[in-house]
């Protein structure tokens, strides 16, 4: 694992500690902190009910602390999720794995503060737009990741039909209504690449806190892939964050092919986050 510089480590650790509090309450279990949604169905950063070591408590985490957090997660009916910077709590992985949970690595990449972002071409007629709470494209943009990250996504014309179905789903299940206040409050920035008819082809988001942010949720409609849309959305999100006084912009990746895209935008390897296999993605 690549170790990041101490100042960068501190910025990212501070961010990870602060941003969930925009969406959740904190419950402390000794050196571990569990984030709990204050309202069912509310937007959440880190998945519903994830835990992380506190900055001061990281060296003191023990098996009993982990067991107490897991018991509370079961009581809440949420996944037994943990996420932390690897070098912030070096002994925690072994303890988590000894408790029977599978740990995954997610390498981080950071955009150097003064690194210019490249100008990326877009396909004819495609535009980039930051979506407001009342944007007519919002429901479809929130539905798109469910298709983009599906195990067996559709392709071709079937994409549009499935996106329409999922748009009705996220509207009906309260997702759209729950996200709107978050957008209005400035706790989330959602950006989409839109086809000429207004249908989102790719989306991504970031949540700002403490002068830092992590770009995530970058996904492309399967039939619109291989046109550079994910890179364009990522670059536009990074530029937007910088324009709004965010000076630490980073992201995580799971596949080397994705890391190569980020590297072409100027992102450079940093540290590593650890999380539990199968835990919910950030939203």
Per-range role (PLM):
Residues 59-142, 146, 150, 276-278:
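Acyl-donor-binding surface of acyltransferase catalytic domains
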Residues 62-70, 217-222, 226-243, 264:
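Conserved acetyl-CoA-binding loop-helix of GNAT-fold acetyltransferases
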Residues 89-103, 231, 255-272, 279:
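Conserved active-site alpha-helix within GNAT-family acetyltransferase domains
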């Amino acid at each position: 694992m690549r170790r990041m510089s101490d100042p960068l480590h501190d910025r990212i650790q501070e961010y990870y500690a602060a941003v969930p509090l925009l969406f959740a309450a904190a419950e402390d279990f000794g050196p571990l902190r569990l984030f709990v949604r204050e309202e069912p169905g509310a937007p959440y950063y880190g998945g519903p009910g994830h835990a992380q070591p506190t900055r001061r408590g990281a060296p003191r985490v023990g098996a009993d602390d982990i067991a107490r957090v897991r018991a509370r997660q079961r009581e809440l009916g949420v996944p037994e999720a943990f996420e932390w910077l690897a070098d912030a709590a070096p002994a925690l992985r072994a303890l988590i794995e000894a408790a029977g949970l599978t740990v995954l690595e997610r390498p981080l990449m950071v955009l150097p503060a003064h690194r210019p972002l490249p100008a990326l071409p877009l396909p004819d007629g495609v535009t980039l737009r930051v979506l407001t709470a009342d944007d007519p494209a919002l429901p479809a943009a929130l539905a798109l990741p469910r298709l983009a990250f599906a195990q067996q996504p559709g392709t071709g014309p079937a994409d549009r039909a499935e996106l329409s179905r999922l748009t009705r789903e996220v509207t009906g299940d309260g997702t759209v209504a729950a996200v709107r206040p978050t957008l209005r409050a400035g706790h989330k920035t959602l950006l989409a690449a839109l086809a000429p008819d207004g249908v989102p082809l790719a989306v991504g988001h970031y949540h700002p806190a403490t002068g830092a942010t992590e770009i995530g949720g970058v996904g492309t409609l399967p039939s619109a892939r291989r046109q550079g849309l994910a890179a364009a959305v990522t670059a536009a999100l990074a530029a937007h964050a910088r324009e709004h006084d965010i000076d630490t912009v980073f992201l995580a990746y799971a596949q080397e092919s994705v890391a190569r895209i980020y590297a072409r935008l100027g992102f450079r390897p940093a540290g590593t986050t650890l999380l539990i296999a199968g835990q919910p993605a950030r939203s």
